[in-house]
Amino acid sequence: MAKEIKFSDSARNKLFNGVQQLFDAVKVTMGPRGRNVLIQKSYGAPVITKDGVSVAKEVDLTNPIENMGAQLVKDVASKTADEAGDGTTTATVLAYGVFKEGLRNVISGANPIEIKRGMDKTVNAIVNELNKSSKKIARKDEIIQVATISANSDKKIGELIANAMEKVGSDGVITVEEAKGINDELTVVEGMQFDRGYISPYFVTDTNKMIAKLENPYILITDKKVSSIKDILPILEEIMKTGRPLLIIADDVDGEALTTLVVNKMRGVFNVVAVKAPEFGDKRKQVLEDIAILTGGSFVTDDLGISFDKVTLQDLGQAESVVIDKDNSTIVKGKGLESQIKERISKIKTAIEMTDSDYDKDSLRNRLAKLNKGVAVIKVGAVSEVELKEKKDRVDDALSATKAAIEEGIVIGGGAALVHVSKRINVNTLNLIGDEKIGYQIVMSAIMSPISQIVSNAGFDKGVVINEILKATNPHLGFNAATGKYVDMFQTGIIDPVKVTRIALQNAVSVSSMLLTTEAVIYDVKDDKEDSVPAMPNMGMGGMM
């Protein structure tokens, strides 16, 4: 496919057109009085949403250069949501504001490289001021406020998230799933749960619920396969003397070993359940070590030189109870030493800090929660599939934003924090030279964009509102767009996570700087020649007999 190139202002103007179209689609969702956007889907009913992330994801323009501009900002906005859980619309609005003012100055002859340096210095100063004005949160009512705002003012979602965090802690694992009915639910799985069920249904102790429950069991933890009953017969005989049940967690239990265990279970000779070990490879070894530490047992593995014939009762884990169904096993109140469990938790926390992989971080956090307070599951219900998807997206965003608020603190919301910060930053203290000062002016103008959009969407005069906040002596004064009143934002619970505001600003300026310093755009050009098969000539009926 042929390529075409556009240069300098011609290229940047086209990129700006794309960014503007994305901005126009996303901006209407901003604030408590933001509007809905209707999105056509390739299949099924259209989706109605007020979620900026969902709107941005659907933007795909026909003009290739305009689409490049839109996609760059869209990617940065999505990255903001991934990192902070919220801020897609804020990042888009800020990026548009910076790019618009920056482009006007570059066209007028300003140096884009110096502008970029000035913008970077200004952003650093703003971030420092945001951190200074932030407030740490810990109380449940504060968590409800943050989660409610991030869920587009849905207080029920805010309360669900706060309740989940109360159960498992702010660093605990909270998952969001679709409920089977229309009601929202919160369930907490206490103890260590992993996604492996009983190997044979003959291990079931409750045929009505189809579960196997073991009270005060011993637990054999190994990454080996158990095929011969002779391998584990010595330890089985020791356990039988105690009269206590046994849970076997192994790579697999099959053949003669499985048959013998099932027969003895059915005859009432010995209460035992066998399950396959969770995960695979090195991750399996790590999880089995977690289970061993949680239950006070030893991990029976060739890597440590431990064979079945050397296993004693002291090598077996113990727990208050174990519940196993066809899909999951849950170990409740393992009897491991508290000091060893804390040491294991500390090592996992260190591993989380050391890794750059989001996948590995999630996996480690999951292990951490299972060793700590368990896993909370928020089940989201709705009347229709369309409503369910939109609601689930809001819960996911609110959950991430709430964790961000706990991590870095909060500032007053509604875009007012950036207005107050602007009063405390002086161009003369930033040591700017040349066109760097233009970069400062661009950013200082752009940070008024979020509050301007929120106020405009609510039908009020943005200029009047901004001037009132700039004149205010109360550093917490802002504008409640839902009621049209000036209020103390902290007292009324209108707050934003610092992390969301910070990352939205940093990402917006980063992508705008990149677009402003773009001097050429290379894009595909469709061939004018049609590749379709030519039409058959009109044969008529002549010559037919």
UniProtKB/Swiss-Prot annotation:
ATP binds at residues 29-32, 50, 86-90, 414, 480-482, 496. It comes from the Bacteria. Keywords: ATP-binding, Chaperone, Cytoplasm, Isomerase, Nucleotide-binding. Its EC number is 5.6.1.7. GO terms for cellular component: cytoplasm. It is an enzyme of class 5 (isomerase). GO terms for biological process: protein refolding. GO terms for molecular function: ATP binding; ATP-dependent protein folding chaperone; isomerase activity; unfolded protein binding. InterPro entries: Chaperonin_Cpn60_CS, Cpn60/GroEL, Cpn60/GroEL/TCP-1, GroEL-like_apical_dom_sf, GROEL-like_equatorial_sf, TCP-1-like_intermed_sf. It is found in: Cytoplasm. Its main location: cytoplasm. Pfam families: Cpn60_TCP1. Belongs to the chaperonin (HSP60) family. Together with its co-chaperonin GroES, plays an essential role in assisting protein folding. The GroEL-GroES system forms a nano-cage that allows encapsulation of the non-native substrate proteins and provides a physical environment optimized to promote and accelerate protein folding. This is Chaperonin GroEL. It comes from Malacoplasma penetrans (strain HF-2). The gene is groEL.
